[in-house]
From Swiss-Prot:
Its main location: nucleus. The keyword Repeat applies. PANTHER family: PLEIOTROPIC REGULATOR 1, WD40 REPEAT PROTEINPRL1/PRL2-RELATED. Belongs to the WD repeat PRL1/PRL2 family. Identified in the spliceosome C complex. Component of the PRP19-CDC5L splicing complex composed of a core complex comprising a homotetramer of PRPF19, CDC5L, PLRG1 and BCAS2, and at least three less stably associated proteins CTNNBL1, CWC15 and HSPA8. Interacts (via its WD40 repeat domain) directly with CDC5L (via its C-terminal); the interaction is required for mRNA splicing but not for spliceosome assembly. Component of the minor spliceosome, which splices U12-type introns. Within this complex, interacts with CRIPT. Also interacts directly in the complex with BCAS2 and PRPF19. Residues 60-79, 136-160 are annotated as: Disordered. This is Pleiotropic regulator 1. Involved in pre-mRNA splicing as component of the spliceosome. Component of the PRP19-CDC5L complex that forms an integral part of the spliceosome and is required for activating pre-mRNA splicing. As a component of the minor spliceosome, involved in the splicing of U12-type introns in pre-mRNAs. Keywords: Acetylation, mRNA processing, mRNA splicing, Nucleus, Phosphoprotein, Repeat, Spliceosome, WD repeat. The gene is Plrg1. The modification N-acetylmethionine is found at M1. WD repeats lie at residues 201-240, 243-282, 285-324, 327-366, 369-409, 410-448, 459-498.
Length: 513
């Protein structure tokens, strides 16, 4: 069906074309709205009243500001006079410890220090700029002050209203005073860490690491689907555990029982009895890969996080799922537990951190400051604070409500892991194989490490997936993409003189987040 076009007369078409031309070239749609004089006057009057109301109508005395002939009246603001100026406008000589010339570029001489009194039109501005009575008294009685009055003149008296304004009206002016900018506190000196040992044995990426409470051995999980137990002192392999059918993503050793817990990309969470070296419990419920796990320090509770956007709380003994913590909109990459509230902290690929109520199984606080995935969270062992790692920044927070403390900028990579010890050394490991060490209190980056990959590995397989301090905090262990575990320890020969703190105080920028 063809739609009929309505026909118009030539007269109508011409005038429509003319209107379009006027709208394009003559119309004033883009011009600013003309100024309304009446509203502009009211606006200026209100501004004057608000800003200058207290001093807008000051009482001025013409006799005190201008006089003819000899000294026939008391000068309200006394100055010394020249006797040669009898019968003329009185000229004043301002004397004191800091004389000023009459204008810029004028040499400072006895003549150029003479200033003529202001005219009546300038009297108002002079009255506003008068000093307070307290300041005049201090100048008059000070050791280097000058006498600003005529011989025999009475003490300077100022109107009561002016006194109250100048003495109490410093509220607005206080914002104009220069305040000392806060500076970064000096960081504590920490000895540098150096590579001590490289342990090889896994056939795939080493994805997780944990040290047992007795500090005798440590355990690692790998992409080769095995869990290996190593002697901490010698670095020798003690035991290999097989059972997972995909990459092992998390391991942890219980402090309350001889159990080892592991999780992997096969959706399985296993409990291993280390007396028999076999699996005694499975925890079923996650719908996708399990990325991390942690044990509650005082309760028999296990918490796991998964790619299915949930974290689950398990009863260790009964294998029952106590709570399913739902709220994240993407994979939950890391989880941490503590005895104090909030007892569970999760970080997710949806860029948020959530603090959970363990009893209710609900979110207490959601932190949205990060702009990219949060892959690592670490709790300080002594302070009531924690840190989170993301490709945009490392951020420090304080419990219980997640108050922001500071940013630790400079590690420009995807941060996979964080670790901190009681001395305040924070370690961040990234996917490009770099490891940065920070002072926890000040956020000062005192060392950067990029260890060489194991011979035979590709350079692209340089990456740190996990790191942990041993129980004595004298050794740092890293799980890396070149299929090795690297052990670092402090350089015992280093001193503050050989490795000084390169501390350059900066003005701290007040950042919102």
């Amino acid at each position: 069906m063809v739609e009929e076009v309505q026909k118009h007369s030539v007269h109508t078409l011409v005038f429509r074309s003319l209107k379009r031309t006027h709208d394009m070239f003559v119309a004033d749609n883009g011009k600013p709205v003309p100024l309304d004089e009446e509203s502009h006057k009211r606006k200026m009057a209100i501004k004057l009243r608000n800003e200058y109301g207290p001093v807008l109508h000051m009482p001025t005395s013409k006799e005190n500001l201008k006089e003819k002939g000899p000294q026939n009246a008391t000068d309200s603001y006394p100055h010394k006079q020249y006797p040669a100026n009898q019968g003329q406008d009185v000229e004043y000589l301002v004397t004191g410890t800091h004389p000023y010339p009459a204008g810029p570029g004028v040499a400072l001489t006895a003549d150029t220090k003479i200033q003529r009194m202001p005219s009546e039109s300038a009297a108002q501005s002079l009255a506003v700029a008068l000093p307070s009575q307290t300041r005049v008294d201090a100048n008059r009685t000070g050791p280097a002050g000058s006498e600003y009055r005529h011989p025999g003149a009475s003490d300077r008296s100022q109107p009561t209203a002016m006194n109250s304004i100048m003495e109490t009206g410093n509220t607005k002016n206080s914002a104009l005073m220069a305040k000392k900018a806060p500076t970064m506190p000096k960081p504590q000196w920490h000895p540098p860490w150096k590579l001590y040992r490289v342990i090889s044995g896994h056939l795939g990426w080493v994805r997780c690491i944990a040290v047992e409470p007795g500090n005798q051995w440590f355990v690692t999980g790998s992409a080769d689907r095995t869990i290996k137990i190593w002697d901490l002192a010698s670095g020798k392999l003690k035991l290999s555990l097989t059972g997972h059918i995909s990459t092992v993503r998390g391991v942890i050793v219980s402090t309350r029982s001889p159990y080892l817990f592991s999780c992997g990309e096969d959706k399985q969470v296993k409990c291993w009895d280390l007396e028999y070296n076999k699996v005694i419990r499975h925890y079923h419920g996650h719908l996708s890969a399990v990325y991390g796990l942690d044990l509650h320090p005082t309760l028999d509770v296990l918490v796991t996080c998964s790619r299915d956007s949930t974290a689950r709380i398990w009863d260790v003994r009964t294998k029952a799922s106590v709570h399913t913590l739902s709220g994240h909109t993407n994979a939950v990459a890391t989880v941490r537990c503590q005895a104090a509230e909030p007892q569970i902290i999760t970080g997710s690929h949806d860029t948020t951190i959530r603090l959970w109520d363990l009893v209710a199984g609900k979110t207490r606080v959601t932190l949205t400051n990060h702009k990219k995935s949060v892959r690592a969270v670490v709790l300080h062992p002594l302070l009531y604070t924690f840190a989170s790692g993301s490709p945009d920044n490392i951020k420090q927070w304080k419990f219980p409500d997640g108050g922001f403390i500071q940013n630790l900028s400079g590690h420009n990579a995807i941060i996979n892991t964080l670790a901190v010890n009681a001395d305040g050394v924070l370690v961040s490991g990234a996917d490009n194989g770099t490891m940065h060490l920070w002072d926890w209190r000040t956020g000062y980056n005192f060392q950067r490490v990029h260890a060489a990959v194991q011979p035979g590995s590709l350079d692209s397989e340089s990456g740190i997936f996990a790191c942990a301090f041993d129980r004595s905090e004298s050794r740092l262990l890293t799980a890396e993409a070149d299929k090795t575990i690297k052990v670092y320890r402090e350089d015992e020969t280093a001193t503050e003189e050989t490795h000084p703190v390169s501390w350059k105080p900066e003005i701290i920028k007040r950042k919102r987040f």
